[in-house]
């Protein structure tokens, strides 16, 4: 079967807004600040995903923006807490799409991991796993992550969708 899409994703997320993780930004946006600093409520709801996430009993949803003016990513997905009128960012991920070019995705992943490792002065954990949303079991995630003391993390991933 032909491989359809390769996706590079850098995810920054935290369980509790900690000092370590909040220094990182994707396309100028930080965890812990309001998404209203960048987008209107109308734009947030227009781009809202139908999926919701239940992380430690707080319901979250995501909203995704595609902007040709982004410097590093083709799309940014932001996770917000349901019923939060301040629209505080709890997790943010940037994506680059590599159609039928998994090796290019892996090169970009390695480049970012090396930069992050030098900056963070810590090691990362890597592995491959089947993507949970592909019922065929043929799609693979190439995942690496840095785990902080407060259980927040930075993940760098390539998805190979089948």
Question: Can you name each region flagged by the protein language model?
Answer:
Residues 35-37, 44:
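Long, hydrophobic N-terminal alpha-helical segment
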Residues 38, 116:
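Hydrophobic pocket/interface hotspot
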Residues 20-35:
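Short N-terminal segments immediately surrounding and downstream of signal-peptide cleavage
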Residues 19-22, 45-111, 115, 124-162:
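Amphipathic N-proximal alpha-helical interface segments
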Residues 3-16:
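Sec-dependent N-terminal signal peptides
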